[in-house]
């Protein structure tokens, strides 16, 4: 751990005027034919600590659903399931997390190009469960027991696309082909084309004959039940009109391509501007909430859907669930982009409650903490600058029917995830830097999210290397990183200021060298909610080379607590 004044990183609070979250009631497990009564299990989402897991990689609790498993081949199913999650809820409690974000549950196109859909993002039928993960009874049992322990469940969903459910019959021979276009003559480009995944075409993917273009390529739905490569379901999702049919995106900076194009890999872009498609998506996912008593959605690829979709989808979902007794239902979106203004746009106009805070992941956790280990570190003034943009870029008022907290105060903070290399990969295994980053994650404003395996010092690189098998760790709860997280989650739980308080930056610096304050970042968390407001002072030294100080040599750091009135305790010491 980096040192401040030669002592451990300081997370100090005044004898913690604490307000911990009350225990919530038990939930019985309904039979397959019964739906659970919907209930609101969350008082304030800022009290939660999210743990993102890939079901297939977390724990294998039922070998009976281990068909097509190839142990150790990370592009293939490994056997994790919902029973495995249920069997290890005690592990998650010991870590101190309070909400589980589970990977998509619906039936997928099983395999493509020798890669399996273990992740869940190649959906084929929104009305059926993925049999690799278990059945309805095992999923309900896991969720009911999680709720019984005070754990909440966020479901990963996709509104942008379906899996590889059809092909473009470019050569009009009625079967999917991979072939080379071009005569091979001088100056004639040679292009390999897959009818499963052709490139973007502004007017739609075209068919060709020997005479040249012959109009829009017919869309032909597949019928291969052995790997679920069949027409999308339900209803309208099995019709040509439900898809844009433009081929895959070539330029992700082109808004038209980004919102109308297929996702690379043959993932078919839905015509989400159509009222019938919108209604189908709202209904299909809401039915799973009703069947399972889920507590929120993490929504994939939100920047690839037209912006007008999100207020409609979110508010229709809120109204439907509230009528059945489910409020404070969290919906946060994933837009893989460092543009803070773009991220914030998804919270405007009463749309999403929150987003995955990618701009912070890139600028802060990569730029400041990770790069401290490998060179090119940014100053901590970059953290303050980004935080100051929140009130400009994110909605600052409570969304009607939403979670009761403005999006600007409920951003989902994370260090890494399943789409980027793990922190320890990029930092060359620097666990001190990781622990420092985790300290910020669990004390800053917003909702912290921890990617599974972080607690076990996983260090995988790019996909699928960053989607390791957790049970190979034997669920060790004694490691330094596991214990560091557990201590921080306990501190957070005990301090209402760290969960709900206002934030004031007290020291940031552009210095990253040998200056006296190089790498220092300090902030206060104050208040929370009456009747027991709290106080916490967080001081971090991101400099890997020296014990820095909260001074520039002449001016010391000032805090809001009057001198002589308060005793601060180093709760990480």
Language-model segments: what does each one mean?
Residues 49-54, 99-104, 125, 152-156, ...:
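Structural recognition of the beta-strand scaffold that forms the well-ordered cores
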Residues 1-9:
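Bacterial N-terminal signal peptides that target proteins for export
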Residues 42-48, 58-98, 103-287, 291-292, ...:
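Substrate-binding/active-site clefts of carbohydrate-active enzymes
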Residues 143, 161, 191-207, 283-406, ...:
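Active-site-proximal helices and loops of the catalytic beta/alpha 8
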Residues 27-32:
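Bacterial lipoprotein signal-peptidase II cleavage site
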Residues 19-20, 26:
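N-terminal Sec signal peptide cleavage junction
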Residues 569-573:
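Solvent-exposed beta-strand/loop surfaces of large extracellular or lumenal domains
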